[in-house]
Amino acid sequence: EAVFHAISLARRNHVAVAFDLDYREDTWDTVEEASLYLSLAAEKADLVLGTRDEFDVMEHLLHTGNQDDAKSAAWLLEKGVSVVSIKKGKKGSHVFTKEGKTVGGIYPAQVLKTFGAGDSYSSAFLFGLLHNMELKDSLRYAAAASSITISGHSCSDSMPTLEQVEDYIAHHEYVLPDTP
């Protein structure tokens, strides 16, 4: 209820709503309950981010078995969502807008742990959008931030600064996935 109240307040005050699905199985009674509430919140957002697995949970009731990123994005775009970002780990990301699909790449890195990668991605991606960067540049920032985070030993200590992200972009190779 608090989430829906916050979304309503944001809407009334012309504040954009970014919704990160951030599904954690142990916080829900059933996948059906998670699917219902995640989809209700997502369709009220301006921007929705999540992993492919999180989109699968959200779509459990609406589009059972769907694995098609474009279909996952289409129903949200039809509801008025402006940006849909599907994080795919080492396969990059797919971002959908009404203008079409943009494929985000990765900065290959030595993985010490994966936790925190999604938070780094989301925060850097949103930073780029809030600073009026091109979508492709926001995706580079997101990929760099994720790579820095997974290369560190702890989650919070590995969260990069803006300077670290920009240095990483300048000195590392950005790789687009073979199959978009």
PLM regions and their residue ranges:
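Conserved phosphate-binding/catalytic region of the ribokinase-like
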Residues: 8-12, 60-180
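Conserved beta-alpha-beta core of the PfkB/ribokinase-like small-molecule kinase fold
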Residues: 1-71, 91-92
